[in-house]
């Protein structure tokens, strides 16, 4: 009877543990990134009343006689199933769809979590606003003017420096893709202003110097009266400026005498054939271009406050790309249809400020600058474990690496089984209330049954005590 008492006590104690876990699950039903717990029971040791006997020629075998001495908690598991995603529309809210944990830095310690309600602090760091833990990843580095993210490097704090500057870049390449009407009238000798205007097609586009100054590139095209399928082009920079910019124009390493004129020749199919100048320079490559040089206005160049000497280059050279020989797309053409103006690309830009940012499914943070540039600022890292169930809970919906979880495998999204990141959403708790209420009923009945075992054993002891009377 004493055995049944202690068995009943173990039932009470361990069903209370299960009830504690259920209560914690229910209380965290709306906790972002929470992972529910689950209690598994196992029986305790058993007392051997009689051992087993081997069968022989005369009798069969005898099974052992054992009395169980109660039960205990086998495991308290953390169930890392996917929680449902809730859209928030907040760009710093991140959810993981699939495997992985966000990596935080709390002092010298690494923490891991599925809760992605992030924000920016005063320094522009991406943090968990509730505790200041900094989100880890890889910050972009500028190499030759391009933003590069090295995901093989050590992870670091992620910064989104809203308001920071994107330095200006001078134009070095301009790409034309306009059509010149084959039926454009020739400009006769002694032409009037109206005839000159009717026989000229003009393309204008903004280009930039190294200081972010804006200049107007203008190219005037007129048909060559001496040669069919040829156009004479005149390139100028800031043609309406009070101080004309001295220019130089080179075709095939031969400079035009006037520094601005070149000849474009088309084939009978309306596509580019060659570019040349009157001095004999010619470009017959697959991609045709001329090189143009202009003086940067003195007002655009900063000067040394002591010596007054300019602190930057005073001339600038860029390539004016006309297109590919024989190509119809992204190249200049000559067809009997209306002339069109299209400079489809140039690689310069003025200085800009970081105005906004966005985070994509790869965790890459892209900055949107006022000058129209989009640059990578960094990438959020994810961590996976061989045994995520072995992680220790660290409070504040975080986990800590343990000796049984394995070492964190930190990498970029989508690599080695890592999930993807959903921006503007949060992962909700994976607690199912219907399941928890069912477990609560079962646990309550188990607790009641264990208490009834104690009551019945007590009544039996009372009966034994009354035998003496």
Predicted regions: what they are:
Residues 1-8:
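Generic N-terminal amphipathic, Lys/Arg-enriched alpha-helix
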Residues 2, 35, 39-439, 446:
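Small/polar low-complexity and glycine-rich loop motifs
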Residues 8, 12-15, 30-41, 429, ...:
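Alpha-helical heptad-repeat coiled-coil segments that mediate oligomerization/polymerization in large
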Residues 462-466:
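N-terminal membrane-targeting segments
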Residues 17-21:
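N-terminal glycine-rich anion-binding loops that anchor highly charged ligand groups
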Residues 450:
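Acidic/polar, glycine-anchored loop/turn motif associated with catalytic or activation segments
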């Amino acid at each position: 009877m004493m055995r049944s008492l202690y068995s009943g006590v173990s039932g009470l104690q361990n069903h209370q543990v299960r009830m504690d876990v259920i209560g914690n699950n229910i209380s965290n039903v709306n906790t972002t990134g929470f992972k529910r717990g689950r209690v598994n029971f196992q029986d305790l040791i058993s007392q051997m009343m009689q051992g087993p006997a081997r069968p022989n020629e005369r009798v069969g075998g005898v099974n052992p006689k054992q009395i169980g001495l109660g039960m205990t908690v086998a495991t308290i598991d953390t169930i890392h199933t996917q929680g449902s995603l809730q859209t928030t529309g907040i760009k710093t809210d991140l959810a993981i769809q699939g495997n992985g944990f966000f990596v935080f830095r709390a002092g010298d310690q690494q923490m891991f979590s599925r809760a992605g309600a992030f924000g920016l602090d005063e320094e522009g760091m991406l943090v968990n606003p509730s505790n200041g833990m900094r989100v880890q990843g890889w910050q972009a580095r500028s190499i030759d003017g391009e933003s590069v993210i090295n995901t093989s490097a050590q992870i670091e704090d992620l910064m989104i420096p809203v308001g920071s500057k994107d330095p200006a870049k001078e134009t070095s390449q301009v790409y034309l893709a306009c059509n010149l009407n084959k039926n454009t009238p020739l400009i006769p000798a002694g032409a009037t202003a109206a005839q000159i205007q009717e026989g000229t097609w003009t393309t204008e586009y903004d280009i930039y110097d190294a200081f972010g100054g804006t200049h107007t590139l203008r190219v005037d095209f007129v048909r060559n009266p001496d040669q069919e399928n040829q156009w004479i082009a005149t390139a100028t920079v800031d043609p309406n400026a009070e101080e004309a910019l001295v220019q130089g124009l080179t075709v095939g390493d031969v400079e035009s005498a006037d520094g601005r004129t070149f000849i474009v020749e088309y084939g009978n199919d309306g596509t580019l054939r060659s570019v040349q100048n009157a001095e004999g320079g010619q470009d017959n490559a697959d991609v045709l271009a001329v090189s143009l040089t202009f003086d940067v206005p003195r007002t655009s160049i900063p000067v040394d406050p002591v010596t007054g000497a300019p602190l930057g280059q005073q001339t600038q050279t860029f390539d004016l790309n006309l297109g590919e020989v024989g190509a119809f797309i992204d190249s200049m053409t000559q067809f009997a249809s209306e002339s069109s103006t299209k400079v489809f690309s140039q690689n310069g830009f003025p200085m800009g400020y970081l105005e906004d940012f966005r985070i994509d499914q790869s965790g890459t943070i892209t900055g949107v600058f006022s000058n129209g540039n989009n640059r990578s600022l960094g990438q959020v890292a994810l961590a996976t474990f061989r045994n995520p169930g072995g992680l220790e809970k660290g409070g504040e919906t975080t986990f800590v690496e343990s000796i049984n979880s394995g070492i964190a495998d930190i990498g970029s999204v989508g690599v080695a089984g890592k999930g993807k990141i959903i921006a503007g959403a949060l992962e909700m708790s994976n607690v199912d209330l219907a399941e928890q209420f069912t477990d609560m009923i079962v646990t309550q009945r188990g607790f009641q049954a264990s208490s009834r075992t104690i009551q019945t054993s007590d009544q039996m002891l009372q009966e034994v005590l009354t035998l003496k009377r």
